[in-house]
């Protein structure tokens, strides 16, 4: 059973069952996955990329097994087996996903008790009792405190006036990470060394001196009354150090998982792009091969036509030589007869008169032959000119065809180069780094080359358009000549000659007459055949009757007669295969020549070979055979 037969027999629901066969072949070693220490896909041998890493090959196999509609069921089953083989047999080749170790924060002497409750994001509190000598406006300026506390690196500072205690309250907000905690604890230690910690603030008595006290905000500050407590409860929340550490670890792991997923998805997208590029490259190679075959067929046909033309010219020259020899022979015969007549001059008067009469006839015949010789010479020269003109026209046509073929080849080559450049650019975009100067330079060069190719393609399309316009003009002239020939030969030539005018879509009466002769008497058969033929001719003209169907897909689709049409099936049952084939032939002709109007169309026809006649055949027939036809009629 061939692979194509297997593909036809595998449905989407049977993919998993069928995958057991290639899986067994993979385990037996029939299909090689590891070749010379490299991992390869045994089912994609035609791709440019052969060597894979384990993760790349696994992503390729799973991607194809769940692939798009362009993948056949056989390909999906094979790649599903490959994915299972990688999981079960080659799992040791899998590269572990690199994950940076989660290192707990090293805070040394600043590390807090894990069970202490802090305000998070980390915040520091500074209070400054206000004396009469103090500048209240300056102390309430947040910018002043931001500069004063700048060495602790707060991200924001807010100053409040606490009316009840006549103090200026300042809250310094730090980053939510461990560097922010270090800044808050450094602030607290700074004030402790100055004897201005929270403990000194709570234990102060009476009117203390005007100085600032500072500490790190904790739960009691969060729950306190006044502007400071309100701000802390609004902007922060209570957290233990262990909660914050656990949350940071979870966030870091989540980011790592997301990055790993993004890398896997990027690799899968890259594999899809690589597959699309390889498929396009293979398609382009097939187009190049087809173009090469077409060009070779064209060259062979051209050589064949040249050989036929050479043989035709040689035949004409041979016929000319033969006629010339025949004319020379007759001239020699006349000269010999004239000499014989001269020997009889001494005969009697009657004989002399007869001899004179014969000489006059001989002279007249000689003049006629000389005239015929001159006409033959002129005809020979005319034939040679016609042959040379025909050869020149044929060479012009061949040159035009070669030029069009060359333009088409160049255009197709440019289009394929453009497609290949686009594929390379897409791969470069996926593989390259935006900061890689070499990649950017290469992509710029490829873009410039792509622009040049597009400009060259536009020039070729413009030139091709001019050539196609000239070709259409030539075709229009040929069609006009055919129409004039059809109009002139209609009624003069018919099916009894090799070349004539046929009405395409008109029924042949002979099959109808033959079948009627078997069913009716001689007198009735002609009438019944004419009636039946006329009825079906009217049926052919009916545009609502469409006994056609489409076969094939894409560019290869064609419209053919539907053998299952009820009217045609009934006709075949009642009147036989010959009548059915006559109607079918007329349908095909009418659909080809006038599908919309559904009426017969005259066409120059080669009745001998059963095909449309060429202009050359018609002109040759008119110049050579029409004289014989006229002589037969007269």
Swiss-Prot record:
Source taxon at top rank: Eukaryota
GO biological-process terms attached to the record: gene silencing by siRNA-directed DNA methylation; regulation of double-strand break repair via homologous recombination
Keyword field contains Protein transport: no
Any coiled-coil regions, as ranges: 288-469
A GO molecular-function annotation: DNA binding
Keyword Transmembrane helix: no
Region (Disordered): 349-375
Effect of a null allele: No visible phenotype under normal growth conditions. The double mutants idnl1-1 and idnl2-1 show a late-flowering phenotype and reduced level of DNA methylation. The double mutants fdm1-1 and fdm2-1 show reduced level of DNA methylation and repeat-associated small interfering RNAs (ra-siRNAs).
A Gene Ontology term for the protein's cellular component: plasmodesma
Biased composition (Basic and acidic residues): 349-364
Keywords for the protein's UniProt record, in alphabetical order: Coiled coil, DNA-binding, RNA-binding, RNA-mediated gene silencing
InterPro entries: FDM1-5/IDN2 (IPR045177), FDM1-5/IDN2_XH (IPR005379), XS_domain (IPR005380), XS_domain_sf (IPR038588), Znf-XS_domain (IPR005381)
Tissue: Highly expressed in flowers and at lower levels in roots, leaves and stems.
Pfam families: XH, XS, zf-XS
Subunit record text: Homodimer. Interacts with IDN2 and AGO4. Forms a complex with IDN2 and FMD2/INDL2.
Function in brief: Forms a complex with IDN2 and FDM2/IDNL2 that is required for RNA-directed DNA methylation (RdDM) and that functions at a downstream step of the RdDM pathway. Required for de novo DNA methylation and 24 nucleotide small interfering RNA (siRNA) accumulation. Binds unmethylated but not methylated DNAs through its coiled-coil domain. May bind double-stranded RNAs (dsRNAs) with 5'-overhangs through its XS domain. However, according to, FMD1 does not bind dsRNAs.
Name assigned to this protein: Factor of DNA methylation 1
Source organism: Arabidopsis thaliana (Mouse-ear cress)
Gene: FDM1
């Amino acid at each position: 059973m061939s692979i194509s037969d297997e593909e036809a027999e595998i449905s989407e629901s049977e993919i998993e069952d069928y995958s057991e066969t290639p899986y067994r072949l993979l385990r037996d070693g029939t299909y090689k996955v590891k070749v010379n220490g490299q991992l390869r896909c045994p089912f994609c041998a035609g791709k440019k990329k052969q060597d894979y890493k384990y993760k790349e090959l696994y992503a390729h196999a799973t991607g194809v097994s769940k692939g798009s509609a362009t993948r056949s069921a056989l390909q999906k089953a094979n790649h599903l087996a490959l994915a299972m083989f990688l999981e079960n047999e080659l799992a040791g080749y899998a590269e572990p996903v690199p994950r940076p170790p989660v290192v707990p924060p090293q805070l040394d002497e600043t590390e807090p008790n894990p069970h202490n409750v802090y305000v998070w994001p980390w915040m520091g509190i500074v209070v400054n009792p206000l004396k009469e000598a103090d500048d209240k406006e300056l102390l309430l300026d947040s910018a002043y405190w931001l500069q004063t506390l700048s060495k602790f690196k707060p991200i924001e500072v807010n100053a409040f006036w606490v009316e009840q205690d006549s103090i200026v309250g300042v809250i310094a907000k730090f980053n939510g990470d461990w560097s922010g905690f270090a800044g808050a604890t450094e602030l607290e230690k700074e004030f402790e060394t100055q004897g201005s910690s929270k403990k000194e603030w709570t234990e102060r008595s009476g009117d203390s001196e005007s100085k600032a006290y500072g500490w790190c905000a904790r739960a009691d500050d969060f729950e306190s009354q006044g502007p400071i407590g309100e701000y802390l409860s609004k902007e922060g929340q209570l957290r233990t150090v262990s909660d914050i550490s656990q949350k940071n670890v979870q966030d870091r792991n989540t980011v790592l998982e997301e990055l790993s997923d993004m890398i896997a998805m990027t690799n899968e997208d890259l594999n899809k792009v690589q597959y699309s590029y390889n498929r396009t490259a293979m398609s382009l190679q097939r187009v190049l091969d087809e173009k090469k075959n077409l060009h070779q067929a064209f060259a062979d046909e051209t050589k064949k036509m040249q050989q036929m033309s050479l043989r035709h010219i040689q035949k004409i020259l041979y016929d000319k030589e033969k006629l010339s020899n025949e004319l020379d022979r007759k001239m020699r015969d006349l000269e010999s007869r004239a000499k014989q007549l001269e020997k009889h001059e001494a005969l009697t008067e009657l004989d002399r008169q007869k001899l004179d009469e014969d000489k006059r006839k001989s002279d007249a015949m000689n003049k006629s032959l000389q005239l015929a010789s001159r006409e033959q010479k002129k005809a020979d020269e005319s034939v040679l000119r016609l042959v040379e003109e025909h050869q020149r026209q044929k060479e012009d046509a061949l040159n035009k065809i070669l030029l069009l073929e060359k333009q088409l080849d160049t255009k197709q080559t440019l289009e394929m180069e453009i497609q290949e450049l686009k594929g390379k650019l897409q791969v470069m975009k996926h593989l390259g780094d935006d900061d890689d100067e070499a990649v950017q330079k290469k992509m710029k060069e490829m873009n410039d080359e792509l622009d040049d190719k597009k400009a060259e393609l536009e020039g070729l399309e413009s030139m091709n358009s001019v050539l196609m316009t000239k070709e259409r003009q030539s075709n229009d002239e040929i069609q006009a000549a055919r129409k004039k020939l059809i109009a002139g030969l209609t009624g003069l030539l018919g099916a009894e000659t090799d070349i004539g005018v046929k009405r395409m879509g008109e029924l042949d009466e002979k099959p109808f007459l033959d079948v009627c002769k078997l069913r009716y008497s001689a007198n009735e058969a002609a009438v019944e055949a004419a009636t039946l033929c006329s009825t079906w001719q009217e049926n052919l003209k009916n545009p609502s009757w469409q006994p056609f169907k489409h076969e094939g897909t894409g560019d290869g689709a064609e419209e053919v007669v539907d053998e299952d049409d009820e009217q045609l099936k009934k006709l075949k049952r009642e009147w036989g295969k010959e009548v059915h084939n006559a109607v079918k032939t007329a349908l095909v002709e009418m659909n080809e020549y006038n599908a919309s109007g559904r009426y017969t169309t005259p066409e120059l026809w080669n009745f001998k070979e059963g095909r449309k006649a060429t202009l050359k055949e018609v002109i040759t027939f008119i110049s050579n055979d029409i004289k014989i036809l006229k002589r037969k009629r007269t």
